[in-house]
């Protein structure tokens, strides 16, 4: 019978345990893949507590060694699997990595992160000034990383599997839109304004198609069928300081669609193509160009739109318009169609939404007058 291994204090060591010359205790085990692993501690009793935890993880089929990686290390591994993401999404991932690194939460071992830890972290970020909308996207990204860890059997539960609204009030304000009367007044002003009139057709197309500004920027002549009066949407054009113009896919498969042309849109597109002057050869197929012959960008148009709104408000002291963005026209289009009782599935298709709840809950801005008219038109139809 072999002699039991003992430490320098005469205590019997268990299978897998040993003591190094420097007095540190170590425990050797095989992980779920059969790879040899070690854990260490200067105190034998504390080492045995670690052994129990390791064994519990192994019994559950979890990877203890990878469970010791930190939150930010897990997040970086998760982001590395998203190499096909759009440039905007990559920039968002990079920003969130920076937010993570600036907080002690990022250094916690993922196997030790509890839902309470994640909740406290998000509340702390909200108190520091991050908006509910930003935190919602951040939680989805970090939660996605923890979900990946669950799928890889590194941890058993996702500590971010809770609703953000359960810990933080949704203080997101609805995007500003113009009423139908304001839309008419604004379009009339833009059409007559010496400087703003060059954006009239851009606004007409956005307001009457519901397309995104990136989709409008990316329109090429072949996307427009004047005979059948329809516009093909299957890509968008973005501009990045680092990469310049980048053609990207639409946001989802549902984003591939055909949008019918109204008479106003038909006339605006004809006018835009007939009035093009200076055109860079590289961009000759694009429809909406700036004065330098290059495709318009969302940033440049947003700046110009703000200038037009300011000019309008200076001329209409008693009828001020809210600050709107290029994307506001998409919201207005959706609201206008809902008020006109367009079929919900038809509107979902035109908007390019994968989920109809996005069409009805986020983009439609219905006021009481519209609700009253819709209801009474139905109830009084037979009177």
Task: List the predicted regions and their residue ranges.
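Basic/aromatic DNA-contact patch characteristic of tyrosine site-specific recombinases
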Residues: 1-69, 73-80, 98, 120, ...
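DNA/chromatin major-groove-contacting recognition/catalytic segments
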Residues: 186, 242-248, 340, 361, ...
């Amino acid at each position: 019978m072999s002699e039991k291994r003992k430490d320098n204090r005469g205590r019997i060591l268990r299978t897998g345990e040993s003591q190094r010359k420097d007095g540190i205790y170590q425990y050797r085990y095989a992980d779920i893949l059969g790879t040899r692993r070690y854990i260490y501690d200067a105190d034998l009793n504390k080492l045995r507590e670690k052994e129990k935890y390791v064994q519990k993880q192994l019994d559950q089929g979890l990877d203890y060694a990878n469970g010791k990686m930190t939150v930010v290390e897990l997040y970086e591994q998760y982001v590395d699997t998203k190499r096909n993401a759009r440039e905007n999404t990559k920039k968002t991932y990079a920003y969130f990595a920076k937010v993570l690194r600036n907080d002690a939460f990022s250094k916690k071992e993922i196997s030790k992160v509890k839902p309470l830890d994640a909740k406290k972290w998000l509340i702390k970020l909200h108190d520091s000034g991050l908006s509910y909308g930003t935190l919602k996207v951040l939680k989805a990204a970090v939660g996605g990383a923890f979900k990946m860890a669950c799928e890889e059997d590194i941890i058993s539960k996702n500590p971010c599997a809770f609703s953000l609204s359960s810990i933080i009030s949704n203080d997101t304000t609805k995007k500003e839109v113009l009423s139908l009367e304001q839309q008419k007044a604004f379009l009339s002003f833009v059409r007559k304004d010496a400087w703003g009139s060059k954006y009239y057709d851009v606004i007409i197309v956005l307001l009457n198609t519901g397309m995104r500004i990136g989709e409008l920027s990316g329109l090429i002549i072949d996307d427009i069928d004047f005979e059948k009066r329809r516009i093909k949407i299957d890509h968008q054009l973005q501009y990045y300081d680092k990469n310049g113009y980048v053609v990207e896919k639409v946001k989802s498969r549902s984003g591939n669609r055909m949008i019918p042309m109204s008479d106003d849109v038909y006339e605006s597109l004809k006018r835009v193509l007939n009035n093009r002057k200076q055109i860079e050869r590289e961009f000759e197929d694009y429809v909406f160009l700036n004065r330098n012959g290059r495709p318009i960008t969302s940033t440049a148009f947003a700046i110009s739109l703000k200038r037009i709104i300011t000019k309008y408000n200076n001329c209409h002291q008693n009828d001020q318009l809210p600050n709107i963005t290029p994307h506001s026209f998409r919201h207005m289009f959706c609201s206008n169609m809902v008020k006109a009782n367009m079929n919900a599935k038809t509107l979902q298709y035109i908007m390019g939404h994968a989920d109809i709840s996005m069409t009805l809950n986020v983009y439609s801005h219905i006021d009481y007058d519209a609700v009253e008219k819709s209801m009474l038109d139905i109830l009084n139809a037979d009177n």
